[in-house]
Each structure stands twice: as structure tokens, then as C-alpha cells.
């Protein structure tokens, strides 16, 4: 009987703590407050006083912050305060205008990146393969042209989209590897890093232009993804093994590009493809007249490809003659 009464008493005391929704530590804290010594009860108040004093010190420091730091602090607390971040870092996007006074709307290139294409270049030039490496490069490109022609046939815009996604790879790979070599060997590059990166950027602008002419379908995007992934890695390895062969290969690849754009122009002149107005991005990039057409755009792009052809054959010739690229000035700005 006595044990039953003791159990009931224990349950009455522990029940609220074991089965209440309120956490146990809050109940224990409430019980502890009743037996807390006077000195201990003062401690929370002292801590609160210290926190308050610290807050006052921080507020005073914030008031004394230099103006840029205060601006950054305001930007951190206000995500929409974009101008404060720009002002703090000292970077202000320039407001550019064209020659006619209208606002420059392109972010990927600036007025000083534009140029007038030299369309007088000979688009019929061809490098006769000499020796096994040249013949291997030539016939590799020719073998790739067969499935390309069967797949695209006369769909020139689709072909151009795929071509430009691949054509922008060699310049980037070559420029990157020459850049790393320059850093690794503590030597100059002869300007070839910049020349090859200019080529890659120019090819990318061709792609941006054709995206204004047509949008790729899902299967074309998948094809581009596969082709670019394979070609980048293959060209990377090829350039490491033999830069001479790699540049010769690209020279022949650019010859095929010139030939493809020549066929494009023939169909435009024959009326098989509508000669639509030129995209605005092409007019600004190549400084074309306001009434330029698609034919004018294809003409300047073909001229660009011919210049890339010459540059890569020239780079291969330099190395074929036993010289190094860094010892021969690169044709920077060769358009």
C-alpha cells in the first residue's frame, strides 16, 4: 500500500514533465529559478547589459565606417541595391553610342571590336598537300565532308549553325595551350595567343549571327553537343601531339567552310533561299549598310573563313620549316 502511494506521488510529480507538450528543460528552468542564488540571478541581467553595450558600440562603429564600406553594408542588407555594389567596387559599365548617336545595345562586343571585312580576299586558294601529315589532314577533312553533305544537303543555315559551333573550337584550344606554354616556359608567344583567340571569338560571332536567322531544333542542339564534345577533346590531343598537323587540319577545314558558304551564296543568288534583311547584330559587327541583306552577311562570313584558312596554313608552314610560332609575329587583327 505504501509503495502504491509512493508510486502515485512520483507519477504526479514527474507526469507533467514526461508527457507535457512543453520541453522538459523549460520546466526544469522554471524550477531552478526558484532555487537560483541571488548572485546567479543577477548574471543574466549582466549579460543582457553587456549585449546592449556591445550593440551600442557596433552602432557607433557603423556610423564611423568609411563611405564605401557603409555602402557595401547597405548593399548586403538590401539585395535590390544593385547600384551600391557597383559603386563600391568602382566598376561602372560605360554608356556607349554609335556614330549616329544611338545607344550601343550589344554587350558581347563593343564598337572597337567591329570592323569592315576584306571581301577582296581570294576565296579559291587551296594548299596542295605535301607529305604524309598534310595528306592525312586533307583526307580527314574530306572524309568528314561526305556525311555532312548527305545530312544537311541544301539546308545551309542548319549547316552553318553546326559548322560555327565546331569552327570556334580550334582557336580557343590553340590559344589556351599556347597561353599555358607561355606561362610554363616563361616565354613570349609572338602574339599567337591573341591571334587564335580572335579567331575563336570571330567564329562565335558567326554563330550569334546565324541564331538571328534561324533557331536550332532539339535534335540539332543534341548533334552540336555531341560534335563539340568529341571535336574539342580530339583537337586538344592533336594539338598537344603535333601543332603543325593541327593547324594544317584547320586550314583545310576552313577551305571546306569557304566552299560551303560559296554554295550558300549561289542558292541566294538563284532565289532558292529568300534574301532576307541582315540581322542587326551583323550590321553593327561588320559595319554593313543599314539596307544590307543575308547575302551580304554570308559574303563577309565567307571572307572571314578565308582569312582563318590563311592564318592556319601560315602557322603550319612556319612549323613545317623548322621555326617556332613565338619567333614569327602573328597576324593580329587579320580580317
UniProtKB/Swiss-Prot annotation:
GO cellular component: mitochondrial inner membrane; mitochondrion
Sequence intervals crossing the membrane: 160-180, 222-242
PANTHER family: ALTERNATIVE OXIDASE, UBIQUINOL OXIDASE 1B, MITOCHONDRIAL
Protein induction: Induced by drought, cold and salt stresses, heat shock, hydrogen peroxide and methyl viologen.
Catalytic class of the enzyme: oxidoreductase
Function, in words: Catalyzes the cyanide-resistant oxidation of ubiquinol and the reduction of molecular oxygen to water, but does not translocate protons and consequently is not linked to oxidative phosphorylation. May increase respiration when the cytochrome respiratory pathway is restricted, or in response to low temperatures.
Protein's GO biological process: alternative respiration
Transit peptide: 1-47
Annotated GO MF terms: alternative oxidase activity; metal ion binding; superoxide-generating NADPH oxidase activity; ubiquinol:oxygen oxidoreductase activity
Protein name: Ubiquinol oxidase 1b, mitochondrial
Amino acid at each position: 500500500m505504501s509503495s502504491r502511494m509512493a508510486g502515485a506521488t512520483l507519477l504526479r510529480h514527474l507526469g507533467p514533465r514526461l508527457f507535457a507538450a512543453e520541453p522538459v528543460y523549460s520546466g526544469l528552468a522554471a524550477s531552478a529559478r526558484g532555487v537560483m542564488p541571488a548572485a546567479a540571478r543577477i548574471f543574466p541581467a549582466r549579460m543582457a547589459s553587456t549585449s546592449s553595450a556591445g550593440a551600442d558600440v557596433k552602432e557607433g562603429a557603423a556610423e564611423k565606417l568609411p563611405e564605401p564600406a557603409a555602402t557595401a553594408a547597405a548593399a548586403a542588407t538590401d539585395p535590390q541595391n544593385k547600384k551600391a555594389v557597383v559603386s563600391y567596387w568602382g566598376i561602372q559599365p560605360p554608356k556607349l553610342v554609335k556614330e549616329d548617336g544611338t545607344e550601343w545595345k550589344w554587350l558581347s562586343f563593343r564598337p572597337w571590336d567591329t570592323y569592315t571585312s576584306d571581301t577582296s580576299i581570294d576565296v579559291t586558294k587551296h594548299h596542295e598537300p605535301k607529305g604524309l601529315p598534310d595528306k592525312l589532314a586533307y583526307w580527314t577533312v574530306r572524309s568528314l565532308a561526305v556525311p555532312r553533305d548527305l545530312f544537311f544537303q541544301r539546308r545551309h543555315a542548319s549547316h552553318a549553325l553546326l559548322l560555327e559551333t565546331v569552327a570556334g573550337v580550334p582557336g580557343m584550344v590553340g590559344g589556351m595551350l599556347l597561353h599555358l606554354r607561355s606561362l610554363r616556359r616563361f616565354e613570349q608567344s609572338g602574339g599567337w595567343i591573341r591571334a587564335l583567340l580572335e579567331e575563336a571569338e570571330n567564329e562565335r560571332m558567326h554563330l550569334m549571327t546565324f541564331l538571328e536567322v534561324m533557331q536550332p531544333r532539339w535534335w540539332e542542339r543534341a548533334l552540336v553537343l555531341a560534335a563539340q564534345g568529341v571535336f574539342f577533346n580530339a583537337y586538344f590531343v592533336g594539338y598537344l601531339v603535333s601543332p603543325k598537323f593541327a593547324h594544317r587540319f584547320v586550314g583545310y577545314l576552313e577551305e571546306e567552310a569557304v566552299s560551303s558558304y560559296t554554295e550558300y551564296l549561289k542558292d541566294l543568288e538563284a532565289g532558292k533561299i529568300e534574301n532576307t534583311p541582315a540581322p542587326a547584330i551583323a550590321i553593327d559587327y561588320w559595319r554593313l549598310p543599314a539596307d544590307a541583306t543575308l547575302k551580304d552577311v554570308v559574303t563577309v562570313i565567307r571572307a572571314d573563313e578565308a582569312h582563318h584558312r590563311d592564318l592556319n596554313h601560315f602557322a603550319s608552314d612556319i612549323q613545317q620549316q623548322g621555326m617556332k610560332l613565338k619567333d614569327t609575329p602573328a597576324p593580329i587583327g587579320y580580317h
